[in-house]
Protein backbone atom coordinates (compact mmCIF):
# COMPACT_ATOMS: atom_id res chain seq x y z
CA UNK A 1 0.00 0.00 0.00
CA UNK A 2 2.80 2.41 0.96
CA UNK A 3 4.78 1.64 -2.20
CA UNK A 4 1.66 2.23 -4.26
CA UNK A 5 1.18 5.70 -2.79
CA UNK A 6 4.83 6.55 -3.42
CA UNK A 7 4.55 5.43 -7.03
CA UNK A 8 1.45 7.54 -7.64
CA UNK A 9 3.23 10.63 -6.36
CA UNK A 10 6.34 9.82 -8.38
CA UNK A 11 4.24 9.31 -11.50
CA UNK A 12 2.62 12.71 -10.97
CA UNK A 13 5.91 14.47 -10.16
CA UNK A 14 7.84 13.01 -13.09
CA UNK A 15 4.91 13.31 -15.49
CA UNK A 16 4.54 16.98 -14.56
CA UNK A 17 8.29 17.52 -14.89
CA UNK A 18 8.59 16.05 -18.38
CA UNK A 19 5.10 16.62 -19.85
CA UNK A 20 3.61 19.35 -17.64
CA UNK A 21 2.54 21.41 -20.66
CA UNK A 22 0.02 18.70 -21.58
CA UNK A 23 -2.36 17.88 -18.67
CA UNK A 24 -3.93 15.00 -20.62
CA UNK A 25 -0.64 13.12 -20.78
CA UNK A 26 0.05 13.76 -17.09
CA UNK A 27 -3.46 12.50 -16.27
CA UNK A 28 -2.86 9.32 -18.27
CA UNK A 29 0.45 8.69 -16.52
CA UNK A 30 -1.06 9.16 -13.05
CA UNK A 31 -4.06 7.00 -13.94
CA UNK A 32 -1.72 4.22 -15.10
CA UNK A 33 -0.35 3.94 -11.56
CA UNK A 34 -3.61 4.58 -9.70
CA UNK A 35 -5.40 1.47 -10.97
CA UNK A 36 -5.28 -1.81 -8.99
CA UNK A 37 -2.67 -4.53 -9.32
CA UNK A 38 -3.27 -6.61 -12.46
CA UNK A 39 -5.13 -9.88 -11.95
CA UNK A 40 -2.78 -11.47 -14.49
CA UNK A 41 0.06 -10.86 -12.02
CA UNK A 42 -1.22 -13.90 -10.14
CA UNK A 43 -0.59 -16.09 -13.19
CA UNK A 44 3.04 -14.95 -13.44
CA UNK A 45 3.56 -15.24 -9.69
CA UNK A 46 2.29 -18.82 -9.80
CA UNK A 47 4.55 -19.65 -12.76
CA UNK A 48 7.65 -18.38 -10.96
CA UNK A 49 6.91 -19.98 -7.59
CA UNK A 50 5.69 -16.89 -5.76
CA UNK A 51 3.48 -16.67 -2.69
CA UNK A 52 -0.03 -17.27 -4.06
CA UNK A 53 -2.07 -16.35 -0.95
CA UNK A 54 -0.09 -13.12 -0.50
CA UNK A 55 -0.54 -12.25 -4.17
CA UNK A 56 -4.30 -12.80 -3.99
CA UNK A 57 -4.52 -10.68 -0.87
CA UNK A 58 -2.68 -7.79 -2.53
CA UNK A 59 -4.68 -8.03 -5.77
CA UNK A 60 -8.07 -8.29 -4.06
CA UNK A 61 -7.32 -5.53 -1.56
CA UNK A 62 -6.19 -3.12 -4.26
CA UNK A 63 -9.29 -4.01 -6.32
CA UNK A 64 -11.81 -3.62 -3.49
CA UNK A 65 -10.52 -0.20 -2.39
CA UNK A 66 -10.02 1.11 -5.95
CA UNK A 67 -13.48 2.79 -6.20
CA UNK A 68 -12.25 5.15 -3.48
CA UNK A 69 -8.52 5.38 -4.19
CA UNK A 70 -8.66 5.98 -7.96
CA UNK A 71 -11.06 8.98 -8.01
CA UNK A 72 -9.56 10.54 -4.89
CA UNK A 73 -5.99 10.17 -6.18
CA UNK A 74 -6.91 11.80 -9.48
CA UNK A 75 -8.85 14.54 -7.71
CA UNK A 76 -6.07 15.31 -5.22
CA UNK A 77 -3.25 15.29 -7.75
CA UNK A 78 -5.01 16.59 -10.86
CA UNK A 79 -8.16 18.32 -9.65
CA UNK A 80 -6.77 21.76 -10.41
CA UNK A 81 -6.07 20.97 -14.08
CA UNK A 82 -8.52 18.20 -15.05
CA UNK A 83 -12.29 18.00 -14.51
CA UNK A 84 -13.13 14.81 -12.59
CA UNK A 85 -16.61 13.48 -11.73
CA UNK A 86 -15.67 11.70 -8.50
CA UNK A 87 -19.12 10.27 -7.47
CA UNK A 88 -19.82 8.83 -10.92
CA UNK A 89 -16.32 7.36 -11.18
CA UNK A 90 -16.64 5.75 -7.73
CA UNK A 91 -19.91 4.11 -8.75
CA UNK A 92 -18.48 2.77 -12.01
CA UNK A 93 -15.34 1.46 -10.29
CA UNK A 94 -17.46 -0.33 -7.69
CA UNK A 95 -19.40 -2.23 -10.37
CA UNK A 96 -16.43 -2.81 -12.68
CA UNK A 97 -13.73 -3.85 -10.18
CA UNK A 98 -14.72 -4.05 -6.51
CA UNK A 99 -18.02 -5.96 -6.65
CA UNK A 100 -16.71 -8.69 -9.03
CA UNK A 101 -13.71 -9.17 -6.71
CA UNK A 102 -15.95 -9.52 -3.65
CA UNK A 103 -18.31 -11.88 -5.51
CA UNK A 104 -15.35 -14.07 -6.45
CA UNK A 105 -14.33 -14.34 -2.80
CA UNK A 106 -17.89 -15.13 -1.71
CA UNK A 107 -18.37 -17.80 -4.39
CA UNK A 108 -15.08 -19.46 -3.49
CA UNK A 109 -15.95 -19.48 0.22
CA UNK A 110 -19.49 -20.79 -0.32
CA UNK A 111 -18.27 -23.57 -2.61
CA UNK A 112 -15.37 -24.43 -0.26
CA UNK A 113 -12.68 -23.83 -2.84
CA UNK A 114 -14.53 -25.18 -5.89
CA UNK A 115 -14.60 -21.71 -7.44
CA UNK A 116 -10.80 -21.46 -7.39
CA UNK A 117 -10.00 -25.09 -8.18
CA UNK A 118 -12.59 -25.84 -10.89
CA UNK A 119 -14.51 -22.76 -12.01
CA UNK A 120 -11.56 -20.40 -12.39
CA UNK A 121 -9.50 -22.69 -14.69
CA UNK A 122 -12.61 -23.44 -16.77
CA UNK A 123 -13.40 -19.76 -17.32
CA UNK A 124 -9.80 -18.62 -17.67
CA UNK A 125 -9.47 -19.01 -21.50
CA UNK A 126 -12.72 -17.15 -22.15
CA UNK A 127 -11.78 -14.41 -19.69
CA UNK A 128 -8.44 -13.87 -21.43
CA UNK A 129 -10.16 -13.40 -24.79
CA UNK A 130 -12.74 -11.05 -23.27
CA UNK A 131 -9.96 -9.06 -21.60
CA UNK A 132 -8.20 -8.71 -24.96
CA UNK A 133 -11.48 -7.52 -26.46
CA UNK A 134 -11.98 -4.91 -23.73
CA UNK A 135 -8.44 -3.59 -24.13
CA UNK A 136 -8.70 -3.53 -27.93
CA UNK A 137 -12.09 -1.79 -27.99
CA UNK A 138 -11.05 0.87 -25.51
CA UNK A 139 -7.68 1.38 -27.16
CA UNK A 140 -9.40 2.55 -30.35
CA UNK A 141 -9.78 5.89 -28.56
CA UNK A 142 -6.04 6.45 -28.93
CA UNK A 143 -5.73 5.23 -32.54
CA UNK A 144 -5.57 8.80 -33.82
CA UNK A 145 -2.61 9.54 -31.57
CA UNK A 146 -0.77 6.36 -32.55
CA UNK A 147 -1.32 6.95 -36.27
CA UNK A 148 -0.08 10.54 -35.89
CA UNK A 149 2.91 9.81 -33.70
CA UNK A 150 5.21 12.68 -32.82
CA UNK A 151 8.34 13.22 -30.73
CA UNK A 152 6.40 13.96 -27.52
CA UNK A 153 4.34 10.77 -27.76
CA UNK A 154 7.47 8.73 -28.42
CA UNK A 155 8.97 10.26 -25.30
CA UNK A 156 5.82 9.34 -23.34
CA UNK A 157 6.03 5.74 -24.57
CA UNK A 158 9.69 5.53 -23.54
CA UNK A 159 8.88 7.09 -20.16
CA UNK A 160 6.07 4.59 -19.50
CA UNK A 161 8.30 1.66 -20.51
CA UNK A 162 11.09 2.83 -18.19
CA UNK A 163 8.74 3.61 -15.31
CA UNK A 164 6.98 0.25 -15.67
CA UNK A 165 10.29 -1.65 -15.57
CA UNK A 166 11.33 0.33 -12.51
CA UNK A 167 8.28 -1.05 -10.68
CA UNK A 168 9.68 -4.58 -10.91
CA UNK A 169 13.13 -3.37 -9.86
CA UNK A 170 11.81 -1.42 -6.86
CA UNK A 171 9.73 -4.40 -5.74
CA UNK A 172 12.80 -6.62 -5.92
CA UNK A 173 15.05 -4.16 -4.07
CA UNK A 174 12.52 -3.59 -1.27
CA UNK A 175 12.03 -7.34 -0.86
CA UNK A 176 15.79 -7.87 -0.67
CA UNK A 177 16.18 -5.03 1.82
CA UNK A 178 13.55 -6.71 4.01
CA UNK A 179 15.32 -10.09 3.57
CA UNK A 180 12.14 -11.72 2.28
CA UNK A 181 12.24 -15.31 1.00
CA UNK A 182 12.22 -16.07 -2.74
CA UNK A 183 8.45 -16.66 -2.91
CA UNK A 184 7.61 -13.28 -1.37
CA UNK A 185 10.30 -11.50 -3.39
CA UNK A 186 8.71 -12.85 -6.56
CA UNK A 187 5.30 -11.67 -5.39
CA UNK A 188 6.64 -8.20 -4.61
CA UNK A 189 8.24 -7.89 -8.06
CA UNK A 190 5.07 -8.68 -9.99
CA UNK A 191 2.59 -6.85 -7.76
CA UNK A 192 4.73 -3.70 -7.86
CA UNK A 193 5.29 -3.91 -11.60
CA UNK A 194 1.92 -4.94 -13.07
CA UNK A 195 -1.21 -2.79 -13.22
CA UNK A 196 -4.78 -3.42 -14.38
CA UNK A 197 -4.42 -1.47 -17.62
CA UNK A 198 -7.79 -2.67 -18.97
CA UNK A 199 -9.64 -0.87 -16.17
CA UNK A 200 -7.40 2.13 -16.72
CA UNK A 201 -8.31 2.19 -20.40
CA UNK A 202 -12.03 2.04 -19.57
CA UNK A 203 -11.74 4.91 -17.07
CA UNK A 204 -9.71 7.02 -19.50
CA UNK A 205 -12.17 6.41 -22.33
CA UNK A 206 -15.28 7.18 -20.29
CA UNK A 207 -14.12 10.20 -18.34
CA UNK A 208 -11.28 11.90 -20.20
CA UNK A 209 -10.19 13.02 -23.69
CA UNK A 210 -8.77 10.34 -25.98
CA UNK A 211 -5.19 11.47 -25.43
CA UNK A 212 -5.38 10.30 -21.80
CA UNK A 213 -5.61 6.69 -23.04
CA UNK A 214 -2.25 6.95 -24.80
CA UNK A 215 0.07 6.53 -21.76
In which residue ranges do the predicted regions lie?
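Short, small-residue-biased leader/transition segments that mark boundaries at the very start
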Residues: 2-7
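Transmembrane alpha-helical segments of multi-pass membrane transport proteins and ion-pumping complexes
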Residues: 8-16, 38-42, 66-76, 96-105, ...
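Alpha-helical transmembrane segments of multi-pass integral membrane proteins
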Residues: 62-71, 93-108, 124-140
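Generic transmembrane alpha-helix signature in multi-pass membrane proteins
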Residues: 11-17, 27-31, 38-52, 56-59, ...
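Interhelical loops and loop-helix junctions of multi-pass membrane transporters/channels
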Residues: 21-41, 58-63, 72-95
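Transmembrane helical segments that form the transport core of multi-pass membrane transport proteins
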Residues: 119-188
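Membrane-interface helix termini and inter-helical loops of multi-pass transporters
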Residues: 15-23, 75-88, 113-117, 142-155
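The feature identifies polytopic integral membrane transport proteins across all domains of life
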Residues: 21-33, 50-60, 86-88, 118, ...
Amino acid sequence: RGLGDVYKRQAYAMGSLFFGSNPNLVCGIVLEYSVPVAVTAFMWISMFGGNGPLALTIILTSSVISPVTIPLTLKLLLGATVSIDVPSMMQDMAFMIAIPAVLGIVINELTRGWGHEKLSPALSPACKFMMMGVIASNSTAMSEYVLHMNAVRLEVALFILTFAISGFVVGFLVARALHLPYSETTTMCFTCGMRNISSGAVIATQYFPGEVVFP
